[in-house]
Amino acid sequence: AADLNRIWDAGQNITSIYSSAYNSEYQTFRQKTFGLEEPFRNVMMQSVSKNPVFCRMMGVRYIVSDSDVTGYALVKKCEKTGIYQNNDAAPVMYATDRVMTEKEYNKLAFPYNQTAFLEYAVVGEHTESSDQNIMTAYTPVSLKMADNHKAQNGAGNRTTDIGKKNGNERKVGTWIHEKEDGWKIHAKKIKKITFSIRQVQQETTQQEGQRQILFLSFCVDNARPNKDVAVWINGIRNKLSAKDHVYYNENKTFIYAVPLKDGEDTISVTFGKGKYQLSHVQAYLGSLPERSKTLYQSEVQVDKKLTKDNEIQGTIQVKNDGWFITSIPYDTHFKMYIDGKETKIQKVNTAFL
């Protein structure tokens, strides 16, 4: 939480903020449109995200970390702290004619509502989309408890129990019941379980060097609404705050995008304390598309000497007529000048300038 507003250098830009004054378009994009993980109980805390799609889209090229960052390469280290780089990160500003209309975007289901931003710019309704919106496909998968956590419990359902059962099979202590569409949890303490990732369809071939991303979403029904609920996937936390919390976060759908290491086919799921049910599970596996000049056709070269205060200046050589895209949250008070002439600004990617 301490890092939400912290920068390491005056020239650094960040995607997180903790403030009562915020850009509503950006917050809606994070929480509703795109669907980022929400690790904090306070709705005002727009966290640093570990979602690799969001990081690429927002141009997060560098991460400072005390441990390895999947998808990023170490470029410098000072004692335990390293600087990690991802050359696939999007430019902060670029021009393109590879677009998708908002109408088409709004039809996309999870996880394509996230990954579309790596292949198209989403623009106004009056523009025709490019290439019938052809996108990288992701394979449906299922998650099953590893064998060492399974115990038969009738009708094929499985339960992992910590504690005792009485003669009426009433479960006490901590237990996790695997249901057809999710899990039912009664945890008096935090419990970590390993799950295997299984292909639902015929297994697809992964090209060497391509890192896999597990996209996971499920609904949370909290049986004790006056208590927080948290679930970690490979250390990535989502939290639903107690309903009576003054800054209740309304995070009733937990969404994750989990980078996997090469050859990794299991995940660690940590169930937080509480009594709750996780249902409507959606899980997909696949690799992100390579950084493409088809989307990032012309990149802005920022003039650091002329860029200061609330003004950014730079040059761009536009190859095709199209749209100017940034990762700056949209606001009606921005002004844009091209070759010295003021140009009308529009909202792109549903929330950006």
Q: Where are the regions that the model predicts?
A:
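Short hydrophobic-aromatic micro-motifs
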Residues: 14-16, 63, 83-84, 93, ...
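Extracytoplasmic/lumenal acceptor-recognition loop(s) of multi-pass membrane glycoenzymes
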Residues: 2-56, 90-115, 121-122, 236-237, ...
